[in-house]
């Protein structure tokens, strides 16, 4: 196996996004600011949902899992990128690269499946309100969430192990700010066509299958909302679902854009920009979208800060 012919001392070089020009230095600190907002926002969401018993519902449990995944995702890539930029070092060990690929792919895959579960939750809440507590009881909700983590992690293991079964006999410079398998495949001196097909199949499973569930769920939700007699009920349903659809659109738009193209057609700059969007920008926007458009989250935050009223 090619792995046996490589040592963990054979480091890769992450070329990153930024150089040390004034413009790029400004952009680097902008990314750090976005990271800080994303880190604090998702941490607050997890803590709020854990601490406030009124948020102990399936919808908010799933939202806390999404925030946890986003929190882990940004911590997988940004700290290493920042360390390399500030220290002037570009190296990452093979073990470090394998670990980064595992968490990176696992978390992206897990989010795909979790977003599908969240859409099913909204479907049951709006279309089957009388059966909601039974259909989304804690055991079922926990199992669906666990399967999201397991399926995503399985894909991460496959990609991490398969990617490092190749030999790297030329340049070890990765034209990215993190270890990303399309960038690594370019460096391999093996025929990667079969593995590219495997990647495409994984993308189908991780993206198209969950998207089908989301589209089906929201098609039924829209029909149910149209037939609602109460204007207040329509408004509440629209507000809740539109927040989720905004997140789905941002996340799947970038993911589908990356996956529908063969690896050989990827350009380094294109990969970097799209990756920055769904690994740094989207995790920052998710808690803002849900908190600004959700009175219960806002109330919980005010209560924790001591500004809420106990009778609210």
UniProtKB/Swiss-Prot annotation:
Q: List the disulfide bonds.
A: 97-189
Q: So which residues have sugars stuck on them?
A: 5
Task: Please list the GO terms describing molecular function.
Answer: G protein-coupled receptor activity; olfactory receptor activity
Extract the InterPro entries matched here: GPCR_Rhodpsn (IPR000276), GPCR_Rhodpsn_7TM (IPR017452), Olfact_rcpt (IPR000725)
* Domain of life of the native organism: Eukaryota
Q: Which keywords label this protein? A: Cell membrane, Disulfide bond, G-protein coupled receptor, Glycoprotein, Membrane, Olfaction, Receptor, Sensory transduction, Transducer, Transmembrane, Transmembrane helix
Q: Where are the transmembrane segments?
A: 26-49, 58-79, 101-120, 140-158, 196-219, 237-259, 273-292
Q: Which residues lie on this side of the membrane: Cytoplasmic?
A: 50-57, 121-139, 220-236, 293-311
Pfam families registered for this protein in UniProt: 7tm_4
Q: What does this protein do?
A: Odorant receptor.
Q: Which family does it belong to?
A: Belongs to the G-protein coupled receptor 1 family.
This chain's protein is named: Olfactory receptor 2M7
């Amino acid at each position: 196996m090619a792995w046996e012919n490589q040592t963990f001392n054979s480091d890769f070089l992450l070329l990153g996004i930024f150089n040390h020009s004034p413009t790029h230095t400004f952009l680097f600190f902008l990314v750090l600011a976005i990271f800080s907002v994303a880190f604090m926002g998702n941490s607050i969401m997890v803590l709020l949902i854990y601490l406030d018993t009124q948020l102990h519902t399936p919808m908010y449990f799933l939202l806390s899992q999404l925030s946890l995944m986003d929190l882990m995702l940004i911590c997988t890539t940004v700290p290493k990128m920042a360390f390399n930029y500030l220290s002037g070092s570009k190296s990452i060990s093979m073990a470090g690269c394998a670990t980064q690929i595992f968490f990176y792919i696992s978390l992206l895959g897990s989010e795909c499946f979790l977003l599908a579960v969240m859409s099913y939750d909204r479907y049951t809440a709006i279309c089957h309100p009388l059966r909601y507590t039974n259909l989304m009881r804690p055991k079922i909700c926990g199992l669906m969430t666990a399967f999201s983590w397991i399926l995503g992690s399985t894909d991460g293991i496959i990609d991490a192990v398969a990617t490092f079964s190749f030999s790297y006999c030329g340049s070890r410079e990765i034209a990215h700010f993190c270890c990303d398998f399309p960038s690594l495949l370019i460096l391999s001196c093996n025929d990667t066509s079969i593995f590219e097909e495997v990647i495409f199949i994984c993308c189908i499973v991780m993206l198209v299958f969950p998207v089908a569930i989301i589209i089906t769920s929201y098609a039924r939700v829209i029909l149910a909302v149209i037939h609602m007699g109460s204007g207040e009920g329509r408004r509440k349903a629209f507000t809740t679902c539109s927040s989720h659809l905004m997140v789905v659109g941002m996340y799947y738009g970038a993911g589908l854009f990356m996956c529908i193209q063969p690896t050989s057609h990827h350009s380094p700059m294109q990969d970097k920009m799209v990756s920055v969007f769904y690994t740094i920008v989207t995790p920052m926007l998710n808690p803002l979208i849900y908190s600004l458009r959700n009175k219960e989250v806002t109330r919980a935050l005010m209560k924790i800060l001591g500004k809420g009223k106990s009778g609210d």
